[in-house]
From Swiss-Prot:
The modification Phosphoserine is found at residues 12, 746, 749. Residues 1-71, 255-277, 299-338, 660-685, 739-798 are annotated as: Disordered. The chain crosses the membrane at residues 855-873. The lineage of its organism: Eukaryota, Metazoa, Chordata, Craniata, Vertebrata. Residues 126-243 form the PH domain. It holds the Pfam family PH. It is found in: Endoplasmic reticulum membrane. InterPro entries: OSBP_sf, Oxysterol-bd, Oxysterol-bd_CS, PH-like_dom_sf, PH_domain. Residues 261-277, 765-782 have a biased composition (Polar residues). This is Oxysterol-binding protein-related protein 5. A 1,2-diacyl-sn-glycero-3-phospho-L-serine binds at residues 383-388, 448, 503. GO terms for biological process: phospholipid transport.
Length: 874
């Protein structure tokens, strides 16, 4: 075979006089890396690349410069060191040619290995997984670091930006084992079986010293993942990197040279569906190695630099072709699916649970500014067009403030899975109350969004391993209207709505009204809940202590279940005490019947009293434990934000406010307002009306709707992942990936492994529901048999007709089961209504004869007649 002939050319020290000893192809990568225990090893194609080229008979050897010269058999004795009499000129020439050919082969092989390593480290498609992990140091303390797993190496960075390299772990000498732990999360250990160092000497950029962190062990590392599912995914990925790294192609396009076989797209499992990451790495920043250093290392021997120009030209030409083919694949319409890069919000500011954060004392300097502003106002005036001073501004946009209601979105996930309508309403009510206890320090007002301003973020649900995406846009400036859309299709809920901000001035107080409705939809049940918002009331502007409260009545209504919740946010009375601040009362009703009553404080404890039992219990409290359970919010990486995204748009104003420079904040704010006026003038001059990018106005309902709204229920057999790109929510489905991607079976099918040139999975890629039975925890864990993922790919090459029939039959069976389930739920709902009506009718006492006014009237007439007759008879 070609590979065997190539090995004979490379490892023999003389022309092939006899059949050389057979070389095991599996040992070729090891032979290439002799003496490189502490250096980064090249990624070898593996043994299954031997069959890519056409096979060749063993007795036929390819012509080489050494084998082209025919040498008599007697002269081959020169190859034996003891036969010194074989020194003919022909023999010397043959030996020189053979040595030259061997050096050429050695140099080419070393260049090939070096180039292959360089391609593997710089090609982002070979990244298996990237996520944050906690690593235990030598001092038994834990630190959170960013880990990037590539075939054969594990790179550790300080932050997701891949700027501060900590170290590189060489996986070819490591063993992997799961480690029990009493703490939360999932532990595993990478260690050297002979207690030797597992670290590489240099970093990917040639660094010799890593970033300063706590000292890490030299012969092992103990990792901790956030959850068991994350840890299992890391185990799968590490086992693949440890045992099957030779099977990982660098890239389909780089491997499929002209005339070679085996370069089909489904032949390279080059990437994995990793866990949802808190941030992803820009492709150009993954491994910016110095190519010249690698080339110099390939020609480290002085004798190897002979004829290097021709080889370099050939290498550059091949590299150019490789890069062109790679870019063509990425730019093609059917290329990899890329999502937005999200980074975890490091700090979150929470106000105090009492009323101290709602009270503020205005300084004398700011009071003078307030008086200048108040002279221009009249009672009842709308403040939407009034420019407020920067010291009353909260350093974030109103679009970002509207996202405060989704830090406890896991309550909506539980509500979507709840079967009882009354319990669903209570969970929705708990979620609604969870959005109010986060208060800014002092009385602050968020920025008025610029027309066309957008804001994107998302939350990771560790329990369900899903994401909640939040997208908002300012769709109107006069009046100011903010539209938003929230989606978590995997957990089965979506929310949309628009808020019109209005403000009224009343002399010593003002009110900020949030006019509008939000619509919560449970996708699997086709239920819609309509919600309204309270208003913010600020008093003590002219005299007294400046205080901010919430007031007004709020309704949460589900028309399908005939359930309704009313909440009354009460303002503090004029002579009230501190116990009267932030009071709330409410009730849950089914039609006209009151099921439960609520009392308490919206920023503290709320109690519920069930009318059926009469007992009172704690309904909601923002305790320390609840505050620790807040979901982590991830925002878009600043480099990927557009010019009109909130964080990037207001970054200079925010920085100035946090630094206390009110003058600079006012200047930066004026620049943004003037730019907005300039854009408005340009639209007027061009006679082209401005149109929102992500939302549109429904002409029938006059409601703002998300352009890319998807209210279809999540299908675990069809849907793989939900991700966001440029404000557009996409759902990755198996039909869209067929013909381009195949799947590898894994113990946890939430983490799929597409085998095309798939890049590192972005933070916005949401993991899918399960399509396999193994370790499945999806909504229908036992609804599909133990089939491989390829059986579910329509148009795939591997499934047999029987498997396709099985898949089709399972889909039909699932649809039938779902329809039966819906019918049962509808029947159960009707029966419950009839039963409750019957019970109420049975409990109601039968009306007595004397309770009828007509009976009393007839009785009076009868008594009157009786008295009259008795009088006459006497």
């Amino acid at each position: 075979m070609k590979e065997e002939a190539f090995l004979r050319r490379r490892f023999s020290l003389c022309p092939p006089a006899s059949t050389p000893q057979k070389t095991d192809p599996r040992k070729v990568p090891r032979n290439l890396l002799l003496g490189c225990e502490n250096e980064l090893g090249p990624i070898t194609p593996g043994r299954d690349m031997e069959s890519n080229g056409p096979s060749q008979p063993r007795d036929e050897e390819p012509q080489t410069p050494g084998s082209a010269t025919k040498v008599p058999l007697a002269e081959y004795r020169l190859c034996n060191g003891s036969d010194k009499e074989c020194t003919s000129p022909t023999t010397r020439v043959s030996k020189k040619d053979a040595l030259k050919a061997q050096k050429e082969n050695y140099r080419q092989e070393k260049k090939r290995a070096t180039k292959q390593l360089f391609s593997a480290l710089t090609d982002p498609s070979v990244v298996i997984m990237a996520d944050s992990l906690k690593i235990r140091g030598t001092l038994k303390s834990w630190t959170k670091l960013w880990c990037v797993l590539k075939p054969g190496v594990l790179l550790i960075y300080k932050t997701p930006k891949v700027g501060q390299w900590v170290g590189t772990v060489l996986l070819h000498c490591c063993e992997l084992i799961e480690r029990p732990s009493k703490k939360d999360g999932f532990c595993f250990k990478l260690f050297h079986p002979l207690d030797q160092s597992v670290w590489a000497v240099k970093g990917p950029k040639g660094e010799s010293v890593g970033s300063i962190t706590q000292p890490l062990p030299s012969s092992y590392l103990i990792f901790r993942a956030a959850s068991e599912s994350d840890g299992r995914c890391w185990l799968d990925a590490l086992e693949l990197a440890l045992r099957c790294s030779s099977l990982l192609r660098l890239s389909t396009c780089k491997q499929g040279r002209d005339g070679e076989q085996g370069s089909s797209p489904d032949a390279s499992p080059s990437s994995l569906y990793g866990l949802p990451t808190s941030a992803t790495i820009p492709d150009q920043d993954l491994f910016p190695l110095n190519g010249s250093a690698l080339e110099n290392d390939a020609f480290s021997d002085k004798s190897e630099r002979e004829n290097a120009e021709d080889s370099d030209a050939e290498t550059q030409d091949h590299s150019r072709k490789t890069n062109e083919s790679g870019s063509d694949l990425l730019d093609s319409p059917g290329g990899p699916w890329r999502g937005t890069t999200y980074v975890e919000q490091v700090q979150e500011e929470l106000g105090e649970l009492d009323e101290t954060s709602q009270v503020e004392t205005v300084s004398e300097e700011n009071k003078s500014l307030m008086w200048v502003l108040l002279r221009q106002l009249r009672p009842g005036m709308d403040l939407s067009r009034v420019v407020l001073p920067t010291f009353v501004l909260e350093p974030r946009s109103f679009l970002g403030k509207l996202s405060d209601y989704y830090y406890h979105g896991d309550l909506l996930s539980r509500a979507a899975a709840e079967d009882d309508p009354y319990c669903r309403m209570k969970l929705v009510l708990r979620w609604y109350l969870s959005g109010f206890y986060k208060k800014p320090k002092g009385i602050k007002k968020p920025y008025n969004p610029i027309l066309g301003e957008t804001f994107r973020c998302r939350w990771l649900h560790p329990q369900t391993n899903s994401h909640t995406f939040y997208i908002a846009e300012q769709v109107s400036h006069h009046p100011p209207v903010s539209a938003f859309y929230v989606s978590n299709r995997k957990d089965g809920f979506c929310m949309s709505g628009s808020i019109t901000a209005k403000s009224k001035f009343y002399g010593n107080s003002l009110s900020a009204l949030l006019d509008g409705k939000a619509k919560l939809t449970f996708l699997n049940r086709k239920e819609e809940y309509t919600l309204t918002m309270p208003y913010a009331h600020c008093r003590g502007i002219l005299y007294g202590t400046m205080t901010m409260e919430l007031g007004g009545k709020v309704n949460i209504e589900c028309e399908k279940n005939n359930l309704q919740a009313e909440l009354d946010f009460k303002l503090k009375p004029f002579f009230g005490s501190s116990a009267n601040i932030n009071q709330i009362s409410g009730k849950i009703m089914s039609g006209e019947e009151v099921l439960a009553r609520l009392t308490g404080h919206w920023d503290r404890d709320v109690f519920i009293k069930e009318e059926s039992s009469g007992g009172t219990e704690l309904f909601w409290t923002p305790s320390e434990e609840v505050r620790r359970q807040r979901l982590k919010r991830h925002t878009v990486l600043l480099e990927e934000q557009s010019e009109l995204e909130s964080e990037r748009l207001w970054q200079h104003v925010t920085r100035a406010i946090r630094e206390g420079d009110q003058h600079k904040a006012t200047q930066e704010k004026s620049v943004l307002e003037e730019a907005q006026r300039q854009r408005a003038r340009e639209h007027q001059q061009s006679l082209t009306p401005w149109k929102p990018q992500l939302f549109l106005l429904d002409p029938l309902t006059q409601e703002w709707r998300y352009r890319y709204e998807d209210l279809s229920p999540w299908d675990p057999l069809k849907d793989i992942a939900q991700y966001e790109q440029d404000g557009i929510l996409h759902t990755l489905q198996r039909e869209t990936m067929s013909g381009q991607t195949t799947f590898l079976g894994s113990p946890d099918s939430r983490h799929k492994r597409p085998s095309s040139d798939r890049r590192l999975r972005k933070a916005s890629d949401q993991p899918s529901g399960h399509s396999q039975v193994t370790e499945s925890s999806g909504s229908t864990p036992e609804s599909c048999p133990d089939l491989s993922d390829e059986d579910f790919v329509p148009g795939g090459e591997s499934p047999c007709p029987r498997c396709r029939r099985e898949v089709h039959r399972l889909k039909m069976l699932q649809e039938a089961v779902l329809s039966i389930q819906e019918a049962q739920q509808e029947l159960h709902r009707h029966l419950s209504t009839m039963l409750s009506s019957t019970v109420r009718a049975g409990q109601a006492p039968a009306p007595s004869l004397l309770q009828n006014p007509r009976s009393w009237f007839l009785l009076c007439i009868f008594l009157t007649c009786q008295l009259f007759i008795n009088y006459i008879l006497k």
